[in-house]
Amino acid sequence: MKESKKRVLVGMSGGIDSTATCLMLQEQGYEIVGVTMRVWGDEPQDARELAARMGIEHYVADERVPFKDTIVKNFIDEYRQGRTPNPCVMCNPLFKFRMLIEWADKLGCDWIATGHYSRLEERNGHIYIVAGDDDKKDQSYFLWRLGQDVLRRCIFPLGNYTKQTVRDYLREKGYEAKSKEGESMEVCFIKGDYRDFLREQCPELDAEVGPGWFVSSEGVKLGQHKGFPYYTIGQRKGLEIALGKPAYVLKINPQKNTVMLGDAGQLRAEYMVAEQDNIVDEDELFACPDLAVRIRYRSRPIPCRVKRLEDGRLLVRFLAEASAIAPGQSAVFYEGRRVLGGAFIASQRGIGLVIEQNKDWK
């Protein structure tokens, strides 16, 4: 198999971003090989046709079974545990980038490339993910679990561009129809409401969980709900309960099948606990004077401090208002636009004791 430092494997979905990625890298002199991972839905005909038009090698990897057994299963399991998952965060290290590395090795490619709107920066011997220039499309939040060995082989050509610039670029290159395509789905295997997807994939879920009670913070029953997996922390719309004032989901108790409701003020938090972290340089993270954390995609970074607990988890202290801490979501730590690491937001049960045990932390 031919090997070259200019041979790069591109993950091709057939969409706007991966098409632009291929064209840009071709212009830079790379030899492009495309691979399309079929994980859900129809045959990737668009990707085949685009690869043929660009004159590049193209392969299709049918990964529907392992994808369903890992990423989709995790997505469902998280909701069944009362957590709010982000499947892209799980998919990137466990599936997408792992598969790209395996195929790159098999096809003699030194590099892998994707259409993520993020950048990479080398500093002090480490590779850091950096937020892309387009704040509306930045995808650095989803990449925090990637290891250094993977990042050292990545190229993200779109990191310095806005989505509109990418559309304009495709139009200039003669890909007019492609430039006008709509946005891809936020979760690639779900069309519409995730609740319908849960019911479709788990027909037994409603019978298994059943209706439960909305309760107040004092434990007073407020009315019935459809089952705890169908609610997320911070949710206001779609509760189908009239309390005479706005109500938000504060807590979810899978064991009791209860969903606690309250007002917006009760969602605020000064601390949170996170787990299963991936930090680039711990000394840098813990000492960073300008550290901020993003607790959901597209949310504003919140100034914070972080310390390691004796049990290995992270305690995060917010230095500005934080609200709707949802277990299962990612907490991604930034210095400016540079990602220093991330972790999964843990269950906040027992956090009062953790705070008390660390009351001298400044």
UniProtKB/Swiss-Prot annotation:
Binding site for ATP: 11-18, 37, 115
Gene (name only): mnmA3
Subcellular location: Cytoplasm
Protein task: Catalyzes the 2-thiolation of uridine at the wobble position (U34) of tRNA, leading to the formation of s(2)U34.
Gene Ontology CC annotation, any one: cytoplasm
Residue pairs linked by disulfide bridges in the UniProt entry: 91-188
InterPro entries assigned to the protein according to its UniProt record, in alphabetical order: MnmA-like, MnmA-like_C, MnmA-like_central, MnmA-like_central_sf, Rossmann-like_a/b/a_fold
Site feature Interaction with tRNA, where: 116, 329
Source superkingdom: Bacteria
E.C. number: 2.8.1.13
GO molecular function, one term: tRNA-uridine 2-sulfurtransferase activity
Protein name from the UniProt record: tRNA-specific 2-thiouridylase MnmA 3
Pfam families on file: tRNA_Me_trans, tRNA_Me_trans_C, tRNA_Me_trans_M
Family: Belongs to the MnmA/TRMU family.
Region: Interaction with tRNA, residue numbers: 137-139, 296-297
GO biological process, one term: tRNA wobble position uridine thiolation
Active site: 91 (nucleophile), 188 (cysteine persulfide intermediate)
